[in-house]
Swiss-Prot record:
InterPro entries: KdpC. The lineage of its organism: Bacteria, Bacillati, Bacillota, Bacilli, Bacillales. NCBIfam families: kdpC, PRK00315.1, PRK13997.1. It is found in: Cell membrane. It comes from the Bacteria. Its main location: membrane. Signal peptide: none annotated. One of its GO terms (cellular component) is plasma membrane. It is a single-pass membrane protein. This is Potassium-transporting ATPase KdpC subunit. GO terms for biological process: potassium ion transmembrane transport. The gene is kdpC. It comes from Bacillus cereus (strain ATCC 14579 / DSM 31 / CCUG 7414 / JCM 2152 / NBRC 15305 / NCIMB 9373 / NCTC 2599 / NRRL B-3711). The system is composed of three essential subunits: KdpA, KdpB and KdpC.
Length: 193
């Protein structure tokens, strides 16, 4: 009996020690460093309106249904963060073809002046997470005609808006040139005032 206690005692102490270190101390240290070094990122990269209310995060896409605004990528989860993910069908899967065809049909209804051959792939396909906040500058540009007609904002101003909101690759190395749809639509909203 005494031998069992002598074996169990260090096991319990080590378990408790690592539980405290890994479950409490380490997360608090990392959170503290993140808050000190990059507070905006640590808090979720939130975007606020004029009344200081959170309206979204620049890291999570939103569904913009009003045709006066720029549309983001297709999302099979309707931008619900708790259901993050996509079906990720193989290119040979007929369900992928159906999903893309449906996206193209919806696109044609909203943007009849843009030939389907000019629609960038990111506007008719899902991302891996279903939450992408960004689109390519070309995906934003092909929507200018529709938005200009509906808002009476000149195309030149809308193209400049896209240019102003375009971000390059992170550190000039990672990712692609992109436009954050939420930030772009907030800038567009300012033009509509």
């Amino acid at each position: 009996m005494e031998k069992k206690q002598s074996i169990l005692s260090p096991i319990i102490r080590i378990t408790f020690t690592f539980l405290v270190l890994c479950g409490l101390v380490y997360p608090l240290i990392v959170t503290g460093i993140a808050q000190a070094v990059m507070k905006d990122n640590a808090d979720g990269s939130l975007i606020y309106n004029d009344k200081n209310e959170v309206i979204g995060s620049k890291l999570i896409g939103q569904n913009f249904t009003d045709p006066r605004y720029f549309q983001g990528r297709v999302s099979s989860i309707e931008y619900k963060a708790e259901a993050s993910g996509s079906n990720n069908y193989a290119p040979s899967n007929p369900d992928l073809e159906k999903r893309v065809e449906k996206s193209i049909e919806e696109w044609k209804k909203q943007n009849p002046s843009v030939p389907v051959t000019e629609v960038p792939i990111d506007l008719v396909t899902n991302s891996g997470s279903g939450l992408d906040p960004d689109i390519s500058p070309k995906a934003a540009s092909v929507q200018v005609d529709r938005i200009s007609k509906l808002t009476d904002i000149p195309k030149e101003k809308l193209n400049q808006l896209i240019k102003d909101q375009t971000e390059g690759a992170a550190l000039g190395l990672f990712g692609e040139t992109r436009v954050n749809v939420l930030k772009l639509n907030l800038a567009l909203q300012e033009l509509m005032k």
